[in-house]
A protein has these predicted regions:
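N-terminal loops that bind phosphate or other acidic moieties
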Residues: 2-217
Length: 217
């Protein structure tokens, strides 16, 4: 899988790998027919039915089965925290990571109850944790730069981060992942990315963030 656009004359642009569409009307109809043939009222499984149809299309099978799902949590710190966008310091990111790895966090408890493997990926926190079971090191820096003052990442850092993600997922044992992220101040860069990708004003895409009400208090 190439991380570069071969049609581009410049290799400085980071390109997201192409993901082909998974919609297959014939397969979706076949899966739905299989569900409707069960001895129960049609539609009685609610959201589970549409989810089964969706997963079947993704896995390209009329009898989808999730195998060894992994919870993949990617952690990183954001330079925009210097602008006071969060009520907490960046050091809390590392504390959250340790809580998950020690099995004390909510996601850890839920994963344990359902027999799911949990991996915490250090993509670039300021205060890295020592090596330990469940921790994957794929750092592209000690946090990003302050996006208000300069680009948060270089093109090469972006390419490396995308490549790291592809490699991490490709190396997982199963056929399903549950994605999560953590990092103090993450609402701000997420809003910047969405505004840029969707071509929307920043005011329309930014939210109050963790611990704040709709008014941002």
């Amino acid at each position: 899988m190439s991380l570069h656009d071969p049609s581009s004359s410049s290799q400085s642009e980071a390109v997201v790998p192409f993901i082909p569409p998974v919609l297959d009307a014939d397969r979706a109809a076949a899966i739905q027919a299989r569900l409707d043939a069960q001895a129960r009222p049609p539609g009685s499984l609610g959201r589970l039915e549409s989810l089964a149809v969706q997963i079947g299309q993704i896995l390209r099978t009329e009898a989808p089965r999730l195998q060894e799902p992994t919870v993949l949590l990617c952690a990183g710190d954001h330079g925009l925290v210097a602008q006071g966008v969060s009520a907490w310091p960046s050091s809390v990111t590392t504390l959250m990571m340790q809580g998950i790895l020690s099995g004390e966090a909510t996601v850890s408890v839920l994963a344990r109850q359902h027999g799911l493997n949990v991996q915490v990926v250090d993509c670039g926190v300021i205060d890295p944790l020592p090596e330990q079971p469940g921790l994957v090191l794929r750092r592209v820096g000690a946090g990003t730069a302050d996006a208000l003052l300069q680009p948060a990442m270089t093109p090469e850092q972006c390419r490396t981060a995308i490549r790291n993600g592809c490699e991490q997922v490709a190396g997982l044992p199963g056929n399903a992942i549950l994605l999560g992220e953590m990092g103090i101040g993450n609402t701000s860069p997420a809003s910047l990315l969405l505004a840029r990708l969707a071509g929307l004003p920043i005011e329309q895409v930014v939210g109050p963030g963790a611990g704040l009400d709709a008014a941002g208090r």
